[in-house]
Amino acid sequence: MFSRYVNYDGKPFYAERGWLIGDGQIGGKAKGIAFAQSAVAEAGLSEEVSFPHTTFVITTEVFDEFMRRNALEPIVRGTEDFSQIEKAFEEALLPESVRSALAGILQRIDSPVAVRSSSILEDDIALAFAGKYETRFFGNRGNLEYRLRRLERAVKLVYASTFNPTAKAYRRKHGIKLASEKMAVIIQPVVGRRRGNLYYP
């Protein structure tokens, strides 16, 4: 099972379902989710084990384009003040094609949303990047434009978390260059039940 996971390519899992945005890497967390769902299905346990009904992935290609278009690399290299980095990322613009894709996602999800990191280094079994990067949640209520702004902000803050002090210190400790890390993003509905105006995960 271990060697099978190491050699597993999770990208087709998302592409075949129309859950993929961009043409880059999907990162370690997204790979793990795809592998787990595939393994459960192959074992005939889909009725016993629940997963979110959709899992969208924004690949590292979008991260690279976002960084380049908004000239963010000089900022992340030029300051240790993470609040400045977060501010710059929040003010930066996502590609219009990605905004359209995010709006499409929100039209398919009517529950609260989790926006999760899936960096390429999270796929390295020799490293422990768990908890180093951001996960953001939002209630996904209101009109589409409002929800889209919330989702965009969450994606940008997950991107910014690539450069948070904890992650940067961990990479320095292990001699990992900044350019070696790239961030994909997972967007999932939060599994739970709604009772009246409340949602219970």
Language-model segments: what does each one mean?
Residues 1-186, 194-195:
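N-terminal beta-alpha lobe that positions the nucleotide/phosphoryl donor
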Residues 196-201:
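Short, intrinsically disordered, charge-balanced linker/junction segments flanking boundaries
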Residues 191:
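Extended, highly charged clamp/arch subdomains and adjacent linkers
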